[in-house]
């Protein structure tokens, strides 16, 4: 079968290609650039527990050496600390330059035998039929490519989106920030800060080796920021934080980032899909566009892998858009609803004690991956089976508990995601202290193993000593991307089969014809 064509070699395209490769699906990644990104420390990303685990699982080795976990999160108002949040009970956000994330994923993709990276080629035409997609590129490799599916991960100006004729409505210039990456010593080593004054807002986020990224909120349609004006911002801000005297600093990189909010009308057209910035733009109030793109990749990869290996139903393939577009739309809606109170300059109301606390909470959520602005999304399951209550609602992300894998090793549950397989998890207290040989063939295990082997799609049987809120002998059915599908009281083969069949959207049916099938070959067709 033909490989999946991935257009775009940023973090999302590379992550998708690696996720597909991890499920045994070959990909061709078409990169318009030369295959190397210039270092830009002022362009960075924040990853939370799920996306950091995903990048690690995909083989990105730059997370450890070029990323920094927040030691704490501080908020201050008019020079006085109002809150300090630490991360003893849950993983701290990971902050790293985007070029480092891209390079780590690119190195992993380059070393994987199922991923082919093609540089210096620009897509200028595509056409579809019932069996696949044909794409034409010009540049380094002027040729036609044949794929089983095609995914546009080619950014905000997506050629794929334009060739498919998909609209991209939204709001421009929602926020504008002056950004600087600099090396200096601040009074709170390794701790991120959100500082709000009467007329300004600044964030400081640590990077390794004493480097910080500083962001100043600017008027969305204000004047250009000159180099002298930016230096003044830097000196005044550092002096305010360091007792009135500007400490020595080394300015490494600067920029002005304008944030837009947009959402593509459709994310699927036949065998062609959109992901990442090609499908959505966000970033205001601390929301993370790259992180949402990685979630797109994880959601789509297992569904395409199932279709590639054994065929998938239209319901399953449609669920990518239904789940991810709904999740991103909710994020954009939450930001739009919060913006007037946080950015509208509503006078005294903004400074009342209750209002200030509410604003602080909402601004913190996006940065720390909490609430409507930042939490990992839940996806409504096709059939909500919850025979046993647990701390995780059906559709929610599962807890990262230690589990015994099929090979007998004990690993975090998240380490086993992303392989295109369902996971069936049995909660069996005591298994963590007994040798696997003593319990694998005893009790519920033989019946459960037989039920798992009979499922309509590939699945792995795991065992955990405990799971939050779950009594002994609870069986959890987990999607390949780590979202809970169902819970059962003990071994229920028929019900487990039905739930697994619902997760895959039922048996494969005939493919739906794309809405746009002719090739587009004229250069003007992809110009705004």
Residue locations for each model-derived region?
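Conserved FAD-binding catalytic core of PHBH/FMO-like flavoproteins
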Residues: 136, 149, 153-259
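Glycine-rich FAD pyrophosphate-binding loop
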Residues: 21-43
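Helical substrate-recognition/capping region of FAD-dependent monooxygenase/halogenase enzymes
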Residues: 2-3, 7, 21-23, 103, ...
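Active-site-adjacent segment of FAD-dependent monooxygenases/related oxidoreductases
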Residues: 39-110, 332
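Core beta-strand elements of the Rossmann-like FAD/NAD(P) dinucleotide-binding domain
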Residues: 140-149
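Glycine-rich Rossmann-fold phosphate-binding loop(s) that bind the pyrophosphate
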Residues: 9-11, 32
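Conserved mid-domain beta->alpha element of the FAD-binding
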Residues: 11-19, 152, 251, 257-337, ...
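A conserved short coil-to-beta-strand element within the FAD-binding core of flavoproteins
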Residues: 119-133
């Amino acid at each position: 079968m033909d490989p999946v064509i991935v257009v775009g070699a940023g973090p999302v395209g590379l992550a998708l290609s690696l996720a597909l490769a991890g499920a045994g699906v070959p990909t061709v990644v078409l990169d318009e650039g030369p295959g190397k990104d210039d270092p830009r420390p002022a362009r960075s990303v924040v990853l939370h527990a799920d996306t950091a685990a995903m990048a690690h699982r995909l083989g990105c080795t730059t997370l450890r050496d070029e990323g920094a976990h927040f030691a704490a999160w501080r908020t201050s108002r008019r020079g006085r600390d109002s809150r300090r949040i630490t991360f003893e009970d849950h993983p701290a956000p990971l902050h790293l330059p985007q070029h480092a994330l891209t390079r780590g994923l690119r190195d992993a993709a380059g070393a994987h035998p199922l991923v082919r990276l093609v540089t210096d080629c620009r897509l200028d035409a595509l056409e579809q039929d019932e069996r696949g997609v044909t794409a034409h590129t010009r540049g380094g490799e002027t040729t036609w490519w044949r794929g089983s599916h095609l995914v546009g991960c080619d950014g905000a100006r997506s050629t794929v989106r334009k060739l498919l004729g998909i609209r991209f409505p939204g709001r421009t210039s929602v926020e504008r920030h002056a950004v600087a990456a600099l090396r200096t010593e601040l009074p709170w080593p390794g701790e991120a800060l959100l500082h709000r004054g009467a007329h300004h807002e600044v964030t400081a986020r640590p990077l390794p080796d004493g480097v910080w990224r500083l962001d100043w909120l600017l008027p969305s349609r204000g004047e250009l920021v000159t180099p002298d004006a930016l230096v003044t911002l830097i000196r005044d801000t550092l002096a305010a934080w360091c007792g009135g005297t500007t400490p020595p600093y080394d300015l490494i990189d600067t920029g002005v980032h304008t944030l837009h909010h947009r959402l593509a009308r459709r994310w699927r057209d036949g065998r062609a899909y959109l992901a990442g910035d090609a499908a959505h733009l966000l970033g205001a109030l601390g929301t993370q566009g790259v992180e949402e793109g990685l979630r797109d990749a994880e959601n789509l990869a297992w569904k395409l892998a199932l279709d590639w290996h054994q065929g998938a139903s239209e319901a399953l393939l449609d669920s990518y858009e239904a789940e991810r577009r709904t999740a991103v739309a909710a994020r954009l809606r939450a930001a739009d609803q919060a913006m007037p109170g946080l950015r509208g300059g509503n006078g005294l109301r903004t400074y009342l004690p209750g209002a200030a606390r509410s604003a602080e909470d909402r601004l913190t959520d996006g940065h720390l991956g909490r609430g409507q602005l930042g939490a990992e999304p839940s996806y409504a399951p096709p059939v909500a089976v919850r025979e046993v209550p647990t701390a995780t609602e059906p559709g929610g992300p599962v807890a990262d508990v230690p589990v015994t894998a099929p090979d007998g090793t004990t690993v975090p549950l998240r380490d086993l995601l992303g392989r295109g397989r369902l996971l069936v998890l049995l909660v069996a207290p005591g298994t963590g202290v007994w040798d696997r040989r003593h319990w694998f063939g005893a009790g519920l295990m033989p019946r459960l193993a037989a039920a798992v082997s009979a499922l309509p799609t590939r699945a792995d049987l795991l065992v955990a000593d405990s799971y939050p809120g779950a009594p002994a002998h609870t069986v959890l059915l987990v999607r390949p991307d780590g979202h809970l599908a169902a819970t059962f009281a003990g071994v229920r083969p028929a019900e487990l089969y039905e739930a697994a069949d619902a997760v895959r959207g039922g048996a494969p049916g005939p493919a739906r014809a794309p809405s746009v099938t002719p090739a587009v070959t004229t250069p003007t067709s992809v110009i705004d």
